Amino acid sequence: RPAKLEDESARQFNGLRRDSDWVNADITVSTSADQVPVAPGYKVSDTTADGRRTIRYKSDAPIQNFFSVQSARYAVATDRWKDVELAVYHDPAHGYNVERMNTAMKASLDYFTAHFSPFQFRQVRILEFPAYADFAQSFANTIPYSEGIGFIADYRDPEKIDMVTYITAHEVGHQWWGHQVISSDQQGGT
C-alpha cells in the first residue's frame, strides 16, 4: 500500500520501483539467428554469427529501470508518425489487428502531444507475446502486448467494442504517465 500524502519521506521513491530510478540503458541480447530480439533503446548494432543473432540497444537519455526484453520469430510492420518510427512486431500468422494498432498509435501520439507535451522517443514499438497472460504494458518506447487481447482478437463485427484501439491508446499514454512524468510512491499516484 502506498504511503500517505503526508509522509514526506516517501517522496524520495517513484511509483514504479523503490530500489532504483532513471538509468542509461545499454542492453545486448543474443538469441537464435532466426529471431528478432527487442529491448528498450535504439539499435546500435545487429550481428549474426555461429547461429546466433546479437542486437545491442542503447537509450539516448535516461529511462526508468523498468523494462522488458523479448525475442521471437517476428514479422515487423512499420509506419511513421511525423518523425517517430512505429513498429508492430508480431507472429506472421497474427496480422489481423496490426493496422488497427498503427492507427491507434498515431491517433494517441496526435492527442497526447497536442494536450500534454512532445513525445520523448524516436520510436514506439508494440511486441506480441503469447497469450499466457492477457495484458499489455508500457515500457520506454516498447509495449509488450498479449496476442489474446490484441493480435488474434476478432473485430469484424462493427458492433463489438474495439478493445485493441482502447488498449493501444492506454499504453501509449503511459509513454507520458510513467515514462516522462512519474508520481512518487504515495497514495494517489499511478
What does each model-found stretch correspond to?
Residues R1-A169:
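Hydrophobic helix-coil surface modules that form long, contiguous segments used
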Residues M101-N102, D185-T190:
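Active-site metal-coordination segments of metallo-dependent hydrolases
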Residues V172-Q187:
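Catalytic Zn2+-binding segment of zinc metalloproteases
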